[in-house]
Amino acid sequence: MRLHHIQVTCPRDGEDLARRFYRDGLGLTEVPKPEALAGRGGCWFRDFDPEGRTTAEIHVGVEDPFTPARNAHPALVADDVAHLESVGARLVRLGFETTWKDRHTFDGYERFHAFDGAGNRVEVLTPAG
């Protein structure tokens, strides 16, 4: 088995903030939702390797009432430490809460945690250089 996607949620009309975080901040590509699901709201994002294969997929669904996931979270792997730092800096520039306090607390990795526009926690990590 392998993981196909993870889903996080946002409040109604939270898609634009999701796009700022997942597309503009993390650098993922927004992909169209299947027509049968498009009416539910939300948006989907993917990352691809150089050969065009999907390497990560995050679905942002609309939930009402909404409660952010402040602890449970997806973790995305950056290419290297420079990429990790670049993504973290971009999220800060975009105004998203980002913390490096646990940068060296996971043996063999460097990482940061950020919170999307709805308050959901996301981890970005890379093998320590």
State each model region's role.
Residues 61-65, 127-128:
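Acetyl-CoA-dependent GNAT
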Residues 51-58, 68, 118-122:
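Short, charged/polar, Gly/Pro-enriched secondary-structure boundary elements
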Residues 9-55:
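Core segments of cupin and vicinal oxygen chelate
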Residues 3-4, 39-44, 55, 102, ...:
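Amphipathic alpha-helical "stalk" segments
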Residues 35-38, 64-66, 103-107:
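A short beta-turn/loop motif at secondary-structure boundaries
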Residues 3-12, 43-48, 65-129:
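Vicinal oxygen chelate
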